[in-house]
């Protein structure tokens, strides 16, 4: 299987706390840098100017980037925020960002909820959110990817209104919206433990031809049967095993490490990135870059 992807290799999510340490790493020999692309949440960087804005520009001139949105609220009841999308579209163009992705969730209901809330697994919700995804793709004039989110309510319970399983819901949205998938391996693990399904089966049932890239991250063990997606710790062995399974199923695909806090030193962080690369080398690449990356034009 071959998949047209916007980037290739190993990725790292850029956080402000990483800018200093990674700026030092820019002086390393290129072959010692264990990542090939980076990801940012546009809401955190669009308004940035001054010194930090220049530092950010230095990163986008050096590496291919993708953008992962936080606040579009694709499943929310309020109209889509086209002012935000206008800013996102300009941001993508300014920094030659290769793909925009968002969460299959909602985060606003007459005000921002400051969390990513899951969408009910119903046919009505499939049609509703798919229509909004198509509107976003039309406005941005490019495909977008959606990420299946971690959730903690029993949304798959028919007694609570569920009409389908999580995997059937995700696949129905992908087909109806004709969009791409951001496969989050840690979310599959967390949801599998919390809701009693096999994450191996979940990943195997996804349409590999729609995957634009993957996320991998750490989580918090609240209890044996309750895991919380935090991006604040090292990736554990069962999640690495799921990544290996994804590569066995689909072939090696671009994969990005998310680390939001408790950020370790470069040596420790780079070791996890190299581990991703090690798994990728075990399998034939399934990725075909959609176009060659070029340095962003100067403003």
UniProtKB/Swiss-Prot annotation:
Coiled coil: none
InterPro entries from the UniProt entry: MbnB/TglH/ChrH, Xyl_isomerase-like_sf
Pfam families noted in UniProt: MbnB_TglH_ChrH
Family stated for the protein in its record: Belongs to the UPF0276 family.
Protein name (Swiss-Prot/TrEMBL): UPF0276 protein ABO_1518
């Amino acid at each position: 299987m071959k998949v047209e992807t916007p980037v290739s290799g190993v990725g790292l999510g850029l956080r402000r706390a990483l800018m200093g340490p990674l700026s030092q790493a820019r002086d390393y020999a290129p072959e010692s840098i264990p990542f090939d692309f980076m990801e940012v949440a546009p809401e955190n960087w669009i308004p940035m100017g001054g010194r930090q804005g220049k530092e950010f520009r230095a990163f986008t001139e050096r590496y291919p980037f993708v953008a992962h949105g936080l606040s579009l609220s694709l499943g929310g009841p309020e109209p889509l925020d086209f002012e935000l999308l206008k800013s996102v579209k300009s941001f993508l163009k300014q920094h030659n960002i290769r793909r925009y992705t968002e969460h299959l969730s909602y985060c606003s209901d007459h005000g921002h909820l400051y969390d990513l809330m899951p969408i009910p697994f119903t046919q009505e919700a499939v049609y509703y959110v798919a229509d909004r995804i198509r509107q976003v793709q039309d406005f941005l004039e490019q495909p977008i990817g959606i990420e299946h989110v971690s959730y903690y309510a029993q949304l798959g319970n028919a007694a609570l209104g569920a009409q389908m399983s999580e995997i059937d819901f995700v696949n129905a949205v992908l087909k109806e919206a004709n969009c791409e998938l951001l496969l989050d391996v840690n979310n599959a693990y967390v949801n599998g433990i919390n809701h009693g399904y096999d994450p191996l089966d979940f990943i195997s049932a996804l349409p590999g031809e729609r995957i634009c890239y993957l996320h991998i991250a750490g989580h918090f063990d609240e209890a044996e049967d309750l895991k919380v997606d935090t991006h604040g710790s090292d990736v554990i062995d069962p999640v690495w095993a799921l990544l290996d399974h994804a590569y066995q199923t689909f072939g090696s695909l671009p994969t990005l490490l998310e680390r939001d806090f408790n950020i370790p030193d470069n040596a420790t962080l780079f070791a996890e990135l190299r581990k991703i690369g090690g798994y990728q080398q075990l399998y034939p690449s399934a990725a075909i870059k959609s176009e060659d990356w070029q340095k962003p034009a100067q403003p």
